UniProtKB/Swiss-Prot annotation:
It is found in: Cytoplasm; Nucleus. Belongs to the pym family. Residues 120-130 have a biased composition (Polar residues). This is Partner of Y14 and mago. Residues 1-27, 52-142 are annotated as: Disordered. Residues 149-181 form a coiled coil. The keyword Coiled coil applies. GO terms for molecular function: exon-exon junction complex binding; RNA binding. It comes from the Eukaryota.
Amino acid sequence: MSTYLQSSEGKFIPATKRPDGTWRKARRVKDGYVPQEEVPLYESKGKQFVAQRQAGVPPGMCPLVAAESKKEREKQERTRAKKQEKESGRQPKAPAPGVLVMPPSTCPPPKVSQQQQQQPSGSRDINSISKAMEDTLKLDAPQEVVDPAKQLKKLRKKIREIEQIESRIQAGEQKKLDKDQLDKVKKKSEILRQIKDLESTPRS
């Protein structure tokens, strides 16, 4: 913020020293001049309206009047709340408007057979679910029979893949195996046994 000195000629900015040691001349300030740093920032009407809303003051209303009316409104709300508390303490709570209050049911409970009474509800549910699952499994069970020739072809293909992996390792082309390749190599003996079993089984 600029510091002004007053003289008989009016306001003026005093002489100041520059960093290199030279002096700036004193400058006279014209009447009504406002320095740039003191000029208020421009705000659009929309920004002013938002600021007034956040402050809780309606546009064009005096802040003092708004503060007084706010205090009065808060006082009335507190009085009303106290009055409602007193009334609610005296009277029983009435049902909310639009809510239908049903009288206690006079219908007799449904009859339960002696067998159902003896059996716990949890076990009844488990039995019914397990029975339904058994029926579903019976219906969904695959009826097809795997062709031994096709199975043998698939197994021989797997063995060829395993042998290719082993030959690449021996040749030094591949040093590290991924998870699938490791699984294939581990299953080599099992696949060979399956091939042997299928070859020894007489074909129909």
